[in-house]
């Protein structure tokens, strides 16, 4: 029986754990004990911080694992790459994973490779001199965010200089390394792109249309596949994504790229994660819309058993999230069992909250059908 190490044990990793068990693999999981919902589902669980890469490596060497992976976790990706590199397993280089994890290093790589992205600065304080430098070199409005976090945490749109200092201070407080990204705001529609890579070859899977709260925090409210973009735009975005992945050195596993497309059709890469998209995009929506089991693909890459994806379906899929901003969805949640196409739903809170990050949401509803489900 092959042994698969899984980094992380939150609800985000549950589809990975369940798929590994379905495939008959022996699972060894590492995560903080708090919130480790997968610890009772795996064969072995170690309450080790997912960023303690050397301690995790030690256990993986003792267990002689055959592969290591994670899904939908930016924080876990560098540890996965480090262990794989040290043990001669399939994965991205540790350097590539670190570059993809830090938004500033990522943007520098994009610039060097000619990948279109917004103008940006990385700052480590909100002193007057820093504010002055930003004002002199960039145009409002701006987006301020931590350089090393995800899930819309600490992200804010800044419309005027008076609130810039507070926005940077908040982003620095959210950042693990106390770095904040300041970038010129790009208007237009927001999409994301899912790829899987193996030994340096990249395979496009799907493009997702997004609906967000908009300013100031841009938290996702809906995801829908496939995108309504033209075939020509699909081809352009796939080509840009391949160049961006190569610039980061991402050669193996899933990737999730986020884009903005202006009204004039200009395309900008906002960021790329060396992991599949969260919010059920990678774990559910890709499979429902294309027929390709993305989670299994990630495991196959880690074990060196990857087979080129075959897209067998052309369905629509999507997810609606419940929060104060989308309380109009409450009757649909109450009647979800009778709505054609709904495949899974859950309401986690009775009292809905206004959201500033994805963790504030109170439920989800996933659908599949021949056409987009409009609620």
What is each of the regions a protein language model found here?
Residues 1-96, 126, 306-307, 315, ...:
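ATP-binding N-terminal substructure of ATP-dependent carboxylate-amine bond-forming enzymes
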Residues 102-181, 187, 199-200, 227-231, ...:
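Active-site nucleotide/adenylate-binding loops and adjacent lid/helix of ATP-dependent enzymes
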Residues 162, 184-250, 254, 261, ...:
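ATP-dependent carboxylate/phosphate-activation module, predominantly the ATP-grasp catalytic core
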Residues 252-258, 308-313:
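Flexible, glycine/charged-enriched surface loops at secondary-structure junctions
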